[in-house]
């Protein structure tokens, strides 16, 4: 009797687990179909019942009270934009206290790898968040900072005693400060970050004891918390061999942060075996293309071609226009149409789209710490035009994936590019982007030849609710209105499979002047963008050097011709004046 009972129980448990989805880990190929919403836990949402207007000044570098429960309570808000993955800031115990460098609300000053950060909640509450995410088919990308451990300074008084599990100096490289000026690889990978007040001791990633401990640790984290993917922080500061071992131990999708404007440098990590990296080499060209910088869309096309040449698989790279370290897209760009074009590029271009929290609310702050605002101060506005735009593009992207099996593995083709526009096609999806701006009242037309289209084929613009017919010569002419982006898909596919796109986004847009408040929360704006010199920004000089080196590039030729033209006009007038003097 007991034997039969045990057999029945075993069969019962087997049947039960057969119907429970396995969420612990997903491959790079699976992640290509996802889109990611990046969150800083402390700044996303307060506990239920907390005062929603609680002050949070990013400049103070203090904990503001966001928790894992807060995230769980606002998953409807995230799903309303169509996201099916979130990237959350590091979860492990950080140094305590508030010194001149502030507090560790961001999670990157790890001091104990075996305990969670109590400021964000308990282990049970974190597990409840994971369970609710997976119940909704939302994956979690966990941010991990393991190349260094945080120790309170000053240097002469520091102690490894509270650093867990590496509580001895033998587990770290000898102290030296990273030399940012020399770009020496030995310094970058073996010296320390931080400062005299907060030291980020550089873990000896060549030490086999350290490697063994971290391999077991990361494997356990993935299994214990049902993690779907991992984001490695600051991969530039450790050898590629270290990250490959960590990635193999995790046995799930991994994406690294390599802060560089060079496609060759970044792609080398992927080509060596790492699944993916955040596409910094494309970030700056995207920003400049849809801003007032003078480089515009032709420079973006050059960057695209460079990355295509250097990388093995661009469709798994993380595409973004902002994060917790960089200025928000609205900081130097207050033109609503251009911002919409930048967002559309991220959502429709090759790779995994990543949207930093607050982008959907048009937060307009500068870099760290200003760009780490409290989202609750926006009241989680689901009527904002950018919130709606992201939702439409996310749902459209999902619908296309269901219809076109190889969509996520197909590279986009540039059909047309000029200084003010770029047209790309990915299977049957055609994206027309421009930087004319919302003030351009002229109805501008762009003509291009879609791949695989026949005369009289019709395309539907899901953003502007317009239909276009292919001409007898195989070309398609679209009209740019107020500088808004255009996303086209065959009308037959829209009508049969995408009925939700029969309504347009634009009639719902209310254009109102920007209102800047202390939280950096602003409404959509009609103002022109602010210009800035790209060479003043990290990675900007690298890209500028690469771009200017390509003398055959059309953009550079155009600038050269303009300069020659000015000289030819100016010199004849200037010479008589010089002679008279």
Swiss-Prot record:
Organism superkingdom: Eukaryota
Residues of the active site: 233, 257
Entries under InterPro entries matching the protein: A-amylase-like, A_amylase_C_dom, Glyco_hydro_13_cat_dom, Glyco_hydro_b, Glycoside_hydrolase_SF
Annotated glycan sites: 291, 332
Catalytic activity: Endohydrolysis of (1->4)-alpha-D-glucosidic linkages in polysaccharides containing three or more (1->4)-alpha-linked D-glucose units
Membrane topology category: Lipid-anchor; GPI-anchor
GO CC, alphabetical: external side of plasma membrane
An MF annotation (GO) of this entry: calcium ion binding
S-S bridge residues: 56-64, 176-191, 267-311
Residues that, per the record, bind Ca(2+) 1: 147, 202, 237
Record text on cofactor binding: Binds 2 calcium ions per subunit. Calcium is inhibitory at high concentrations.
Cleaved signal peptide residues: 1-24
Essential cofactor(s): Ca(2+)
EC number: 3.2.1.1
A Pfam family assignment: Alpha-amylase
Keyword Metal-binding: yes
Gene Ontology process terms (BP): carbohydrate catabolic process
Localization terms from the record: Cell membrane
Keyword Metal-binding among record annotations: yes
Protein residues bound to substrate: 109, 231, 236-237, 261, 325, 372
Keywords attached to this entry: Calcium, Carbohydrate metabolism, Cell membrane, Disulfide bond, Glycoprotein, Glycosidase, GPI-anchor, Hydrolase, Lipoprotein, Membrane, Metal-binding, Signal
Site keyed Transition state stabilizer: positions: 325
UniProt similarity note: Belongs to the glycosyl hydrolase 13 family.
Protein name (database record): Alpha-amylase 2
Record organism: Schizosaccharomyces pombe (strain 972 / ATCC 24843) (Fission yeast)
């Amino acid at each position: 009797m007991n034997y039969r009972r045990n057999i029945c129980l075993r069969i019962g448990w087997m049947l039960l687990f057969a119907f429970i989805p396995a969420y612990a880990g997903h491959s790079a190929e699976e992640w290509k179909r996802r889109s990611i919403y990046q969150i800083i836990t402390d700044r996303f949402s307060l506990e239920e019942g907390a005062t929603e207007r609680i002050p949070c000044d990013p400049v103070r570098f203090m904990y503001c009270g966001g928790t894992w429960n807060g995230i769980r309570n606002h998953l409807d808000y995230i799903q309303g934009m169509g996201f099916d993955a979130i990237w959350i800031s590091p979860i492990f115990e950080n140094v305590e206290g508030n010194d001149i460098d502030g507090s560790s609300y961001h999670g990157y000053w790890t001091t104990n790898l075996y305990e969670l950060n109590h400021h964000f909640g308990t282990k049970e509450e974190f597990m409840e968040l994971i369970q609710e995410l997976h119940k909704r088919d939302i994956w979690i990308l966990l941010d991990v900072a393991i190349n260094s451990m945080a120790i309170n300074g000053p240097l002469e008084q520091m102690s490894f005693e509270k650093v867990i599990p590496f509580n001895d100096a033998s587990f770290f490289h000898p102290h030296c400060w990273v030399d940012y000026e020399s770009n020496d690889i030995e310094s970058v990978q073996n010296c320390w970050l931080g400062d005299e007040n907060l030291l980020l001791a550089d873990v000896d990633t060549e030490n086999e004891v350290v490697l063994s401990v971290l391999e077991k640790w990361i494997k356990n984290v993935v299994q214990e918390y049902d993690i779907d993917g991992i984001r490695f922080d600051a991969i530039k500061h450790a050898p590629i061999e270290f990250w490959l071992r960590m990635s193999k131990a995790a046995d799930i999708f991994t994406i690294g942060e390599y802060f560089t404007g060079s496609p060759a440098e970044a792609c080398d990590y992927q080509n060596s075996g790492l699944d993916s990296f955040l596409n910094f080499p494309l970030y700056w060209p995207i920003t400049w293309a849809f801003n007032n910088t003078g480089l515009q869309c032709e420079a973006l096309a050059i960057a695209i071609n460079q990355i295509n040449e250097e990388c093995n698989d661009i469709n798994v790279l993380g595409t973004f226009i902002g994060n917790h370290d960089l200025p928000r897209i609205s900081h130097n760009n207050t033109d609503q149409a251009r911002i919409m074009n930048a967002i559309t590029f991220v959502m429709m271009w090759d790779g995994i789209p990543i949207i930093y929290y607050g982008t959907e609310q048009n937060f307009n702050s500068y870099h760290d710490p200003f760009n780490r605002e409290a989202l609750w101060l926006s009241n989680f506005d689901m009527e904002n035009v950018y919130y709606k735009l992201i939702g439409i593009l996310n749902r459209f992207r999902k619908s296309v994936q269901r219809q076109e099996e190889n969509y996520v593995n197909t590279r986009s083709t540039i059909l047309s590019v000029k200084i003010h526009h770029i047209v790309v096609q990915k299977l049957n999806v055609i994206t027309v982007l421009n930087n004319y701006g919302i003030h351009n009242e002229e109805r501008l037309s762009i003509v291009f030849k879609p791949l695989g289209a026949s005369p009289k084929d019709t395309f539907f613009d899901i953003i502007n609710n317009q239909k276009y017919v292919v001409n007898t010569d195989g070309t398609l002419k679209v009209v740019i209105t107020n500088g808004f982006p255009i996303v086209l898909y065959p009308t037959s596919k829209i009508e049969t499979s995408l009925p939700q796109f029969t309504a347009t986004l634009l009639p719902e847009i209310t254009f109102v002047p920007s209102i800047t408040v202390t939280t950096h929360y602003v409404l959509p704006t009609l103002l022109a963008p602010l210009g800035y010199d790209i060479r003043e920004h990290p990675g900007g000089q690298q890209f500028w050097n690469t771009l200017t080196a390509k003398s055959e590039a059309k953009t550079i030729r155009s600038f050269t011709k303009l300069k020659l033209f000015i000289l030819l006009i100016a010199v004849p007038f200037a010479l008589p004046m010089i002679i008279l003097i």
